[in-house]
Amino acid sequence: MAEDKGVKNMLEHLVKNLLVEDVEEIELRNVTIELDELELDLKTVAQTLPVEIWERILKPEVEEKEREVEVPEYEPPVEEYEGCVAEVQIGATRSDGGSRDRVVVLGGERAYFPFEEPRPNPPVVTFDVFDTPDVGIPGPIREELGDVIEDPVDWARTVVKRYGVDIVTVHLVSTSPKLHDAPVEEAMETLEDILDAVKVPIIVGGSGDPEKDVEVFVKAAEVCEGERVMLSSINEDMDFERVVEAAKEHGHVVLTFAPVDVNLMKSLNKKVLNRGLSKEDVVMDPTTCALGYGIEYTIDVMTRIRLAALKGDEHLQMPISSGSTNAWAAREAWMKEESWGPREYRGPLWEAVTATTVALCGADLLMMFHPWAVQVVMEAMEYMAEGRVTGDAYVTDVIA
């Protein structure tokens, strides 16, 4: 035991001197230590060191200096494109032979990303108006608009004055054989009344019936001569050539429609151009699938169309329209389900997110339905165009 204690004392003495005298290495010569087990307790030694020794040990010999890190300037990858999107004007002022107090210009993009080149014409919101309320208007929209939906003229006048939209879409759905089968002449009277009531550009929509819509559009082209309306929409399943001829004769724009397919969209556009319309007379709708109901397909198709246009495909170099109102086809937008939250908020949020998403993918015209969603998206489009918000773009503020 005495020998073990002596060895321990010797080792403690050596370690202490090692720390105190800054000895980095110690060499023992002609020393033999035979032990079954060796345990060094440095805490005992460390506790005996004076404060000044600890300061000397812990203080670095060379103080670290703050190093200035050079951050390279970030330059986003800017591509140059050989093609561009045509500019399409909807509406005509008195100087153009019409009676509108403004026009709307769509398209004109020369780049895909705004950091490559800002969009010359920001996306435009058009408010949907129906010539009859018997079309299954969602409850939240009925509650917000009130009695104006009973009169399409009052409806159009209200959305222009109250919500400040620059263009209105008039859907003549009463002409549908499956609804009221209203005569074309009766629908034209409604259209003329709306043209007199509001002075913003007008989009003329049909009922979706491929035969009746041709008659509606041909007559509307005649009635609206000089006003440069957009006839919405034509597709491969109808006698679209008659509509194209009427639009060409009376100076209007046509909206081509294809069901989420780039090749079908391109094929229809090519046929329309071959009939004599120019790219400046055509807007295309590749179909908008609602948020949660296939919007990823719409994102893919719109992105591919826009990139193809910028790369030089002349049959896809037209502005893109989005039926963002389709968001209301999602049951999450309108169904009464307490666990989903109040539907009066859900619906407009669903529509606003759908519209904003497609706008980021290249959509130039956003057809919308709920006033709150319209206000939010109009503010968002202004932010996209100018990089700032001039009003309250927050949904909660709009709702309040």
UniProtKB/Swiss-Prot annotation:
Pfam families: CdhD (PF03599). GO terms for biological process: one-carbon metabolic process. It comes from the Archaea. Part of a complex that catalyzes the reversible cleavage of acetyl-CoA, allowing autotrophic growth from CO(2). Probably maintains the overall quaternary structure of the ACDS complex. Belongs to the CdhD family. Heterodimer of delta and gamma chains. The ACDS complex is made up of alpha, epsilon, beta, gamma and delta chains with a probable stoichiometry of (alpha(2)epsilon(2))(4)-beta(8)-(gamma(1)delta(1))(8). This is Acetyl-CoA decarbonylase/synthase complex subunit delta. It comes from Methanopyrus kandleri (strain AV19 / DSM 6324 / JCM 9639 / NBRC 100938).
